[in-house]
């Protein structure tokens, strides 16, 4: 219902004309890592140029086809099923970068699935359950020990700086991936060249002339080629929908009506057939805590103060 609630709100904006006009909801475009920097990067090209040419579908595509149509990612919620069943094809190894086993449904079953893999490489900043089930564990850098490129909606870009030197022999995820690509001699020269060169390529449409000066600069800088969005552009170019219109009845969802999905954003009652008078409470295992991110920061004093007592949600 969260998905349909979002769709309903968007539909009301369309019906009342409060979309893609000055002072209304405006479409959002992604520059890098789901952030809008006001310019089109080469992030998709960076991936597509070396995308494996295979007929193997991503994990979860058959079970979650709408997700697969909308998001260029596998669906991890189906990972354990594929490992255990070997269908539609077997999985033999896993690279677990900061994987939190508690995020997955039926955690014990997920861990059992991991144990069936022939090899697991894991990295993390803590000795987690995933690390305990790995064959090789690499220490990862915290955000305090590494740099990264970030872009912002204000048309700025920033090359962050580490605030402390690396503690012991840890490395950040991107460096681990790039160095593994070199060690395995993958056919991807750009990836083998390292994180900095990759980001220089991805962000090149932004028009930054002196990348070294940008990397050395303390704080964000304006992106030369970034431009503010002009209201009305999206509607003028035509919505990227099957009908080319703003759809209240989603044709993309309609393809999967046999999966129980409704093209209209309607409320779906619980599948539980219990009598609400006799059983007035609903047990929810997916509730979000405002003071934590999954299993993170539970032991930090200031967010813990927002929720001092343990409870059952």
Residue ranges and their predicted role:
Residues 1-85:
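Acidic catalytic cores of enzymes that act on phosphate-bearing nucleotides/polynucleotides
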Residues 22-28, 122, 139, 192:
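A structural signal for short, well-ordered beta-strand segments and their strand-loop junctions
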